[in-house]
Structure formats: C-alpha cells, structure tokens
A protein has these predicted regions:
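Transmembrane signal-anchor hairpin modules in multi-pass inner-membrane enzymes, especially those
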Residues: 1-78, 84-92, 98-121, 125, ...
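Alpha-helical transmembrane segments of multi-pass inner-membrane proteins
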Residues: 8-20, 36-48, 73-80, 93-106, ...
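Short aromatic-rich membrane-water interface segments that cap or initiate transmembrane helices
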Residues: 25-26, 84-95, 157-172, 273-282, ...
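Membrane-interface catalytic loops of GT-C/OST-like multi-pass glycosylation enzymes that act
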Residues: 28-31, 87-91, 166-170, 212-215, ...
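Transmembrane alpha-helices of multi-pass inner-membrane enzymes
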Residues: 37-44, 181, 224, 362-423, ...
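Flexible juxtamembrane loops connecting transmembrane helices in multi-pass membrane enzymes
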Residues: 161-162, 223, 251-287, 369, ...
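TM-adjacent membrane-interface loops and short helices in multi-pass inner/ER membrane proteins
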Residues: 168, 282-322, 329, 336-342
Length: 597
C-alpha cells in the first residue's frame, strides 16, 4: 500500500506539471510551476516517513550545493535590502531557492535509507509516464495540428515542430531525455522488459526528432557515450543506449521523406536551413561578456540581467528581448560578479565530481541509481549551457532531488558503516520525518497560496463580465505579494483610453494632464523590458523633464529594430527632423544604474 502511494505521488510530481496546457495571463508557465511546487512537496511528505539513518550535518555530502544555494540567497537578498530589486521578485527567488534546498535534502535522505533504490525506481517510473504522455502530445502537434484546443493540448507556435504542453521544444527534449535515462535505469533494475524498453526508447527518440531540438541531439549522443563507457551496464542496456543515435538518424530521415512526399511541414528541415545555428546565442553571449567586463567584481545585481543589458548600448544586439544569458556560468558572472560566481560554480562542480568519483566504485543497484541520477543532473546542466531550464520549477525541483540522491548515494556506504547508522529506524524516523514533512507541507501550501496571489494580477489581463474597472484591478494587483510587478507593468503601459469612465458622469473641462508617474517602472522594468514598456518609460521620462534620458532609452529601443516601435520614430522621418527626444542622440551615454527609479 505504501509503495502504491509513493508511485502515485512520484508519477503525479514528474508528469502533471508538464502535461498542464491550460494557462492564465500574464505568465504562460506559472500554473505549471505552481503545480510542481505542490506535487513535489507532496512527494517529500510521502517519502519523509520512511526509515533512514541519521546523519550529522557535517557529514552530509550535499553540503557544497547547500552552501552554493545559501550564497545565491544572499546575492538575492542584497539588492532587495538596498531597495533595488522589487520585493515581489526577491521573494519569488528566495522561495524557489528554499524549495530547492528542501528537494535536495529530501533526495539525499532518500538515497541513504533502505528504500533508496525503490524510491529511485519510482522516480524513474514517474519520468517514464511523463515521457510517454508528452511523446503522444508531440505526435498530435505534428501530425494532427488541428486537434489541439489550447486547454488540454497546447498549440504549437512553430509549424512542423513539437513543443509539448510546456510550449518549448528544448524543454520537451530535456524532459524526454530524462525519460530515456529512466527507461535505461528501469531496464537495468529488471523492472522493464527488453522489448518494452526498445519500443519506449524508439518512441522517445522519435519525439525528440519531432521537437527538432539541437540540445536534444546532443543529449542523445551523450546517452550513446554513457552506453559506450559504462561497462557495468548489462549488454542489453548498452546496446539500447548505443542504438539511440541510429534511431535518431532513421527517425530524421523518415520525417524528411514524409515531409517531401506529402507536402507536409517538418520543423527539422527549417532548423537545418537556419543561417544562425546559435539562435542568437553568440550575440547575447558577446553582450554578456561585455557586461562582465564592465562590472567584473560585483556584477549588475541578482535578477538585473535584462535591465542592465537593455539599457546598455549594444548597436549589434540580438533583436529578441533576452531576460537570460542562455548560459548558467555567464548568467551568474554577469549578475553576481566573477568572484562569487566562480565560487558558486566551483561548489557545483565539486558536487558533481564527488558522486562521479563514487560511481566508479559503487556497484549493484545502488551504483546504478547513482549513475542514472547523476546523468540526469549532467544532462540538465548541459542544457543550462545553452538555455535556462533551471529557472522553471518543473525542472529545478526534480533536478535538486536527483542531485541530492546522487550525493546521498555516493556517501551511503560510509554513512551506513558509521556509528550514526546504529540508531534504530524508529528513532531515526521520529527525528527526521517531522522536519521533512513540515518542509514538504510548506511547499504544498506555498504553491497553493501563490495561485491565490496570482489571481490578483491575472484579472488585470482578462475582461470578464462584471469585473471591476481596470484601474481598480491594477491597484489591487499592485498589492500582490509575489506578482505586483505584473500589475506595475499594466500601470506603466496604461494608455489614457484604457481607463473606464463612469456611465452618466458629467464631463467638466479636464485639468491639465499631470506627467505620468515613474513609480510603476520600478517594479515593471526590473522584470522584463520589452517594446511597449520601453516606449511608455521613454514617454514618462520626457514628460517628467528627463528628455535626455528619454533619448537614451529611445536609442536603445531603436537597436532592437522592432516594428512595434515604428510609431515612436515616425515623426523623425519628416524634414526638418523634429527636436523631440526620439529623433536625436542623447547628449551623453548613461549608465544603466542612472535609470533606477
């Protein structure tokens, strides 16, 4: 009965967040992430009552990651303390980092107990179910694109490519590669038949091809490398892993032939035709290195990458509005400075090296579980060199659990032979379970309360019948604990025509229009600067007598070459050129810190 409950919670935690297609503006992934908090918290609660040996904190193998996370918490606290980072953004970051600590400790605790291998097998079962269902969604998105309704199955915004219900092909491929590791692990643990493993592996590789993700291709090659070098795997498992690149090639050729013969769309062909193989990453990496050179010691501040990058002159910048460097080490170096980023990355690398070293010696099912969990972390780490999957709770939390498991497993033999393991299961359970249960319950409650708080801003972006006037909805949203920056965005970009006048009200001669307030930009600009917000901010700066700063902002906006900003520069085409702020260069180049409201 206990095992069935654990299996149900593992499947729900792994699969449900990636299957939820329904979303509510302004965030397309918030509900998925909130669901991840709730379900992974429930998984922690379910595992907390299992007997595990008591381990002193100084003996815990997960300490390098805990120290790194503590440093990141301090880095997030500092700009909030000094009034730079809005409280809603700081609290969101801190809550996520604390949740990461909970899953890390829970994973390590699971690996130390007698249920360790069983729990990892159930973890793999969860990703197996998630992968099969997401593969089915991928097939529908490519072969029957008219079927998705947006609520149960998401529409693919990229013709001929699968994006899953997470709506991102790279996220889909990362999830599917975890599913592949789970298939190999379950086969090796003799919990999956060979024929079933081959069918499931072929399905996974086919779905990765449908996503046309380059990250997915690299990960498939990594699977083959695992099969090549890990000689402790059975012959059947090694053949399965070594065959994955061949499966990929055959699936790609088959899809290409299908597209040519039937005049269908295969997104992989478009990917091959792209001239910029980096997808603008080389450009954003070059800009990030420039930011690092400008602020090498302290960085631009935690969470301030988009703010600093958008306001710094980069004439050849990528035209997309990047809120991340698409490379974890570069992101950390740019935001928290080279010294602290180097320390954090060194701790992370040490926390990878330690289980990797132990994997060379630990045999049996425990050794296999260690290698599989470590490979899952390595795969998402490689993805983090090209994207930012760990900024999403549905990847971050299971990564923390798997990493904790790998660290706990690498030290389990030493722990179990120590005097600490002589404590009885009953004593150990009573000492450990309440704290983990409380932490898991906090995640469940936190995820649920976050949804309630989110409704305070989601109503701003809906037009339900009987809703309060827009200005009132914005004011209510600005009182949100975690999402007030979304309400600030609405307030900052609110056009005069968006206000809803009272029916039948008299219309006296209006007084002179006051300049737009700058306060809403303090929250909105630190979340994401886009075309609409930059235009509104430039207009507000000019109206408040800061025309030269408005010219600087307009010059930065022009670098993005976005059609939505053409209206701002339309008057500049007239002869002679007007003296308005969008039409002339600023008298000097401003540092991005000078725009702090």
């Amino acid at each position: 009965m206990v095992r069935h409950h654990l299996a149900a919670t593992a499947i729900a935690a792994c699969a449900a967040p990636s299957l939820l297609a329904y979303n509510v503006s302004p965030s397309a992934t918030f509900l998925n992430q909130a669901l991840a908090f709730v379900l992974w918290g429930w998984f922690v609660i379910a595992c907390a009552g299992l007997s595990t040996p008591r381990v002193a904190w100084r003996q815990r193998a997960e300490w390098p990651v805990l120290v790194a996370l503590a440093l990141l918490c301090a880095a997030a606290l500092a700009p909030w303390w000094f009034g730079v980072l809005p409280s809603s953004l700081a609290l969101s970051v801190l809550g996520t980092l604390v949740a990461t600590v909970v899953l890390l400790v829970a994973g390590a605790q699971a690996a130390r107990g007698e249920w360790g291998t069983v729990l990892f097998a159930l973890f793999c079962l969860g990703w197996l179910c998630a992968g099969v269902l997401n593969a089915g969604i991928s097939i529908v998105q490519v072969f029957a694109p008219e079927w998705p309704d947006g609520d149960w199955i998401a529409h693919s915004g990229i013709p001929g490519r699968a994006v899953g219900n997470l709506r991102q092909p790279n996220h889909l491929s990362s999830l599917l590669l975890w599913y592949c590791v789970a298939v190999a692990g379950l086969l090796e643990l003799k919990r999956l038949r060979r024929v079933a493993a081959w069918v499931l592996m072929a399905l996974m590789v086919f779905a990765v091809v449908l996503s046309a993700s380059r990250t997915g291709l690299v990960s498939v090659l990594l699977l083959a490398l695992w099969g090549l070098i890990d000689k402790r795997l059975s012959r059947a498992t090694r053949l399965l892993l070594l065959a994955s690149p061949l499966m990929y090639l055959l699936a790609w050729l088959g899809m290409s032939a299908w597209a040519e013969l039937g005049a269908h769309r295969f997104g992989g062909a478009a990917r091959l035709a792209e001239t910029d193989v980096s997808g603008s990453r080389f450009g954003i990496w070059a800009n990030t290195l420039a930011l690092i050179r400008q602020q090498p010691l302290m960085g631009v501040g935690f969470g301030e990458f988009n703010y600093a990058w958008s306001l710094t002159p980069f004439p050849g910048r990528p035209i997309a509005f990047f809120d991340h460097a698409h490379n974890l080490p570069l992101q950390l170096a740019a935001e928290i400075g080279l010294p602290l980023a180097t320390l954090v990355m060194a701790l992370f690398l040490y926390a990878l090296w330690r289980p990797a070293k132990a994997a060379l010696h630990l045999a049996g099912d425990s050794g296999l579980a260690l290698r599989c969990s470590l490979l899952m972390v390595v795969m998402i780490g490689l993805h983090s060199l090209l994207e930012y999957p760990l900024w999403y709770a549905y990847f971050l939390l299971p990564t923390a659990w798997a990493w904790g498991y790998a660290l706990g497993a690498c030290a389990s033999s030493g722990v179990l032979s120590s005097s600490a393991s002589t404590a009885s299961s009953e004593t150990t359970t009573s000492a450990t379970a309440p704290r983990l249960m409380a932490a898991g319950a906090a995640l469940v409650m936190g995820g649920a309360l976050a949804v309630v708080d989110y409704t305070r801003v989601s109503v701003i972006f809906s037009s339900a019948e009987g809703a309060a006037p827009l200005v009132q909805r914005i004011a209510a949203g600005q009182r949100s604990v975690l999402f007030s920056h979304h309400a600030d965005y609405a307030a900052a970009t609110l056009d005069e025509g968006d206000a809803e006048p009272a029916v039948g009200a008299s219309l006296p001669t209006p007084p002179p229009t006051p300049p737009p307030p700058l306060a809403p930009f303090k929250g909105a600009a630190h979340y994401l600067l886009d075309t609409r917000l930059m235009m509104a901010w430039a207009k507000a700066l000019a109206a408040n007598g800061r025309e030269d700063q408005a010219s600087h902002l307009a010059a930065r906006l022009k670098e993005f070459r976005n059609e939505q900003s053409d209206a701002l520069f339309a008057a500049c085409a007239k002869a002679p050129s007007p003296a308005a702020y969008p039409c002339h260069a600023p008298q000097r180049v401003y540092n991005w810190r000078e725009f702090m409201p």
